[in-house]
Regions:
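C-terminal hydrophobic helical "lid"/dimerization subdomain
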Residues: 3, 252, 297-349
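Rossmann-fold NAD(P)-binding glycine/threonine-rich loop
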Residues: 269-285, 297-303
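Glycine-rich beta-strand-centered segment in the early N-terminal region that forms part
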Residues: 23-37, 50-100, 105, 126, ...
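Short N-terminal strand-loop motif that marks the start
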Residues: 1-65, 127, 131-135, 149, ...
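Adenosine-nucleotide cofactor-binding segment
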Residues: 174-183, 195-253
């Protein structure tokens, strides 16, 4: 079936309207009318081939929310009319250790929502900057937020799970001091989630202008990471630091703030590498630097349910489909609080 979308034909061209083809639903598939799709910084990286390997035409978008309009005859979990979401994963091998553990995000054969080879047919996946999508029911997620919050739920499908998964894995909660580095699309979700988990949350920013905003998001303290005295006041005090910054920076500035056995987890993906950390800083206090990538389907559903229970959504700015290129430029300037979301109904205008 032909539908309308917005995508790029090359790394050097702006995004533009295009028609794409979706498969008809199979026995286990769910067909979704997309209401909103979040704009992730990784969309920009992929469209401009900054991470290499982009296949064109590229239709980005992996923060998808909408309503079920049809299901295959073997689908058991969903019915037409259900509010659902689709995140970064639309398929995996389903039988490896990672898939059996509900960690499809680490499956060697995970299929991304866009720019991945399609497993059962020629071509590559096309994402949520489009009117509809067809996905196997295993990778569809139930949304329990009220309808009026649906647009602000969209970024939870990437920014939400990207921050929730490491916070859960490293046991953020009451009695724990948690740092969040960066107050952008990822960082603002990290602050909200760590606060809701009961941790003492310290936000790190290089911008004085973000100090009050960070407190409004739930930070107990805010530190200007360019202020040596403010940083020194927190030496050896953090159980866990969630580093959301994608730009290369000095990781040693933050590892020295960890307690013995503390961990800093990186979720921002820089286009060029960070400077190598000072190994002795890690050795002397058994510090760890780790990475984390989104989350599996069960954990993503857990995150959505947690957010619905605690009234958590992203802070968003709604845009039309014809404003995506402008939104990309604004995103590069840091001119968004904190996530753009496309109103997919404007694809027909």
């Amino acid at each position: 079936m032909k539908i309308k979308a917005v995508g790029a034909y090359s790394a050097k061209q702006p995004l533009e309207p295009m028609d794409i083809t979706r498969r008809e639903p199979g026995p286990n598939d769910v067909k979704i009318e997309i209401a909103y799709c979040g704009v992730c910084h990784s969309d920009l990286h992929q469209v401009r081939s900054e991470w290499a390997g982009t296949v064109y035409p590229c239709v980005p978008g992996h923060e998808i929310v909408g309503r079920v309009v049809a299901v295959g005859d073997q689908v058991e979990k969903y019915a037409p009319g259900d509010l659902v979401g689709v995140g970064c994963i639309v398929d995996s091998c389903k039988h490896c250790e990672e898939c059996e553990d509900g960690l499809e995000n680490y499956c060697d054969h995970m299929t991304g929502t866009y720019n991945s080879p399609t497993p059962d047919e020629p071509g590559h996946t096309l994402g949520g900057y489009s009117q509809q999508i067809v996905v196997h029911e295993r990778y569809v997620l139930r949304i329990r937020h009220p309808q009026e919050q649906l647009a602000a739920v969209a970024p939870l499908l990437c920014a939400g799970i990207t921050t929730y998964s490491p916070l859960r894995h490293w046991q953020a909660g009451p009695g724990k001091k948690v740092g969040v580095v960066g107050i952008g699309g990822l960082g603002h979700m990290g602050i909200k989630l760590a606060h809701a988990m009961g941790a003492h949350v310290v936000a790190f920013t290089t911008s004085e202008a973000k100090r009050e905003a960070a407190k409004a998001l739930g930070a107990d303290e805010v530190v200007n990471s360019r202020n040596a005295d403010e940083m020194a006041a927190h030496l050896k005090s953090f159980d866990f630091i969630l580093n959301t910054v994608a730009a290369p920076h000095n990781l040693d500035d933050f590892t020295t703030l960890l307690k013995r056995d503390g961990t800093m987890t990186l979720v921002g993906a820089p286009a060029t590498p960070h400077k190598s950390p000072e190994v002795f800083n890690l050795i002397m206090k058994r510090h760890a630097i780790a990475g984390s990538m989104i989350g599996g389907i069960p954990e993503t559903q857990e995150m959505l349910d947690f957010c619905a229970e605690h009234g958590i959504v992203a802070d968003i700015e709604m845009i039309r489909a014809d404003q995506i290129n402008e939104a990309y430029e604004r995103m590069l300037r840091g001119d968004v609080k904190y996530r753009f979301v496309i109103d997919n109904r404007t694809l027909t205008d």
